[in-house]
């Protein structure tokens, strides 16, 4: 698999090597009491997911997490922990993403917005179906972390 392609400048014809790099994303496990917030996605792939999204240019991961939580759930969050980073090239059918997952606390009632048609509270041990991406595994890792303070598997 080629990790770069050549593109030509339309003005001068100079060939530029353009690298094909993974896209950085964040996911936010938002805790409200003993439940977590999940969104039902408006866009493909359809299903339930942890709120999150793509990092904008010039934005930190924490800023992205806070922005995405607000856009998709209407909630103001307090980031309390970085859980892990997930980098399986096949984790997202839209392309290779690398996601940093945060745990956050919030108060209030989630309301779907932006590309989330719904935002609802669920017990992390009773997830809706279908779950998108690798988010079922992320929630399993979250439960292990909540129980033991660590995650035993490597990514």
Question: Model-derived features: where do they sit?
Answer:
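Acidic, metal-coordinating catalytic segment for phosphate/diphosphate chemistry
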Residues: 1-27
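Conserved Nudix-box catalytic region and its N-terminal flanking loop in Nudix hydrolases
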Residues: 26, 31-72
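Short acidic capping loops at alpha-helix termini that bridge into adjacent secondary structure
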Residues: 35, 77-80
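Short beta-strand element of the conserved SAM-dependent methyltransferase core
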Residues: 7, 28, 102-106
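Residue-level preference for beta-strand/loop junctions
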Residues: 22, 46, 94-98
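Unchanged
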Residues: 55-78, 86-142, 153-155
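Generic preference for hydrophobic
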Residues: 28, 79-82
């Amino acid at each position: 698999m080629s990790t770069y392609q050549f593109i030509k400048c339309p003005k001068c014809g100079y060939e530029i090597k353009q690298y094909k790099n993974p896209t950085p994303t964040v996911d936010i496990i938002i805790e409200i009491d003993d439940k977590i917030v999940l969104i039902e996605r408006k866009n493909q792939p359809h299903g339930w997911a942890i709120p999150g999204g793509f990092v904008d240019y010039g934005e930190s991961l924490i800023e992205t997490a806070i922005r995405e939580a607000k856009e998709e759930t209407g909630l103001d969050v307090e980031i309390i922990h970085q859980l892990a980073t997930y980098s399986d090239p096949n984790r997202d059918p839209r392309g290779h993403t690398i996601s940093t997952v945060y745990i956050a606390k919030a108060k209030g009632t989630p309301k779907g917005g932006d590309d989330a048609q719904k935002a609802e509270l669920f017990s992390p041990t009773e997830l809706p179906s279908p779950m998108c991406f690798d988010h079922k595994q992320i929630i399993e890792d979250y439960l292990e972390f909540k129980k033991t303070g660590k995650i035993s598997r490597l990514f």
